[in-house]
Amino acid sequence: MSTYAVTYRYQASHDELAELRPAHRAWLQSLLEQGAMLASGPLGDFAGALLIFKATDEIELSALLDNDPFDIAGFISERVIEEWNPVFGPFN
């Protein structure tokens, strides 16, 4: 299993995001409970988010992320997936 850093950029309004946020967070919570997601949260400007995942490969992770309610609703304008090698901290 590899660790991946995922960055989202949103194209939805704050109101649109707020309306769908409970479903988005329920989806994230299920991934946390399964051990697929390690951490997530909004970026400082609230125009996107950073998510940390464990996955076999980028293809598997991309397919998983396609199920995000924010993505299904078309709220994500950009999604960047990068393999990450955490040397220090809780994710190594």
Each predicted region: which residue ranges?
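Conserved, structured core segments of small domains
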Residues: 1-92
